[in-house]
Amino acid sequence: MNRLIATIVLSLTYSFSILISVLTKGWLKSKTRRGRIIVNGTFHNPNWFHAHITPLVNSGYGEVILVCDAPIAELPNLIYECPPNWANKIFSRAGAKFFWTFIQGFKRPADIYIGYHIFPSAVTALICGRLFGAKVVYQLTAGELELQGGGWNVENKVMVALSRPSKLVQALAHALMRQYDLAIVRGSNAKNYVLRHKFRNALEVVTGSVETKLPISDSKDIDLIFVGRLSEYKRPDRLLDVVAGVARSIADFKATLVGDGPDRKALEKQVRNLGIEKNVTFLGQRDDVPTLLSRAKLFVLTSRWEGVSIAMLESMAMRSVPVVSNVGDLRDFAINGETGYAIDEEDKEGFITTIVELLSDERRRAYLAANARQLVVEKCDRDILSKRWSDILNDLRN
């Protein structure tokens, strides 16, 4: 029953959005430059917000109207429009953000609408953008995973209710994707996927931004660090199995897990069952993540899927070597033998061996760490990406 409901909801939503786009594209085109962008999305933490919204605001294009659940950080030229609780209760959070985004078209007409993740934010951006004669941008937050099989494998309550791939929803998702004036992907894997499925409009690879000018600790006293949500999506259970394997070779090995989530209690139990209480520390949510990253020798992710992890980029900027799953676009930055390692997600022994070898070879680790930082500084520095966004937005509007 859940699969049927999800299929109906997604199919009707995508079909309606495509119809609106086809009927209004070009017909309601605005010729007046308004110097304003409307962004719709959900931002789970300040790091994600600054990685993606701050470069938009700093691009110099103009005012940014952010329709989201709650204010996160104050920035010049950033205006929050957050639906009140009564609207969330009546329409749902996604529905309320749709109506608030629509209302902005009258209150603050914009040149460009941007949505993160195809459902529901990018759908909202497409419908509202087309109705008000604006350009529309789709940011593939989770890469091709949010399109493959209709997005059944992503962290989204409606899409995950599909429970298995849906050819119908996937076909509609691909057709919907082709309606956007610009698609933003995080790396080469997602770019190739979008091109294979006949996207012919503007396409850009833009990662999240990181602050590369923060102080870096001289003391690397954390052997391994994980930063992320403690949920099945990130597979921290797999990470703990790896930690147990490393601890058999390096008795005083220390792993630090930063973040919280629904799986924390189960993970703490797993630590006890594996007998690695002395090797693992759960820190929960922290405000000093950059400081912790700067103290880490290795940054490890055993996720079953990622786009490009912001935490990984931040760790690389702090001269921490990434050892991550070879999923999504992580390998664009974790380049084997040059800046880190991308390992098959199921290869537990590969993770264990690589981590043990890196912790035992300081010279090799230093070489990788220096290269990792250089790559991130060149491609992901916040100032550089602000300029990149300025060029992209102006080209799109012109």
What are the residue ranges of the model-derived segments?
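Conserved donor-binding/catalytic core segment of Leloir-type glycosyltransferases
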Residues: 37-39, 210, 216-234, 239-243
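Short His-centered aromatic/hydrophobic patch
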Residues: 115-121, 140
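Membrane-proximal helix-turn-helix segments that form the acceptor-binding/catalytic region
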Residues: 131, 162-182
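A conserved nucleotide-sugar
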Residues: 225-228, 236-282, 360-364, 398
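Aromatic "clamp/platform" in nucleotide-sugar-dependent glycosyltransferases that forms part
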Residues: 285, 304
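Short hydrophobic beta-strand element within catalytic cores of glycosyltransferases
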Residues: 321-324, 334
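Conserved acidic donor-binding segment of nucleotide-sugar-dependent glycosyltransferases
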Residues: 336-337, 341-348, 357-362
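A short, well-ordered alpha-helix in the C-terminal region of glycosyltransferases
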Residues: 350, 357, 364-379, 385-391
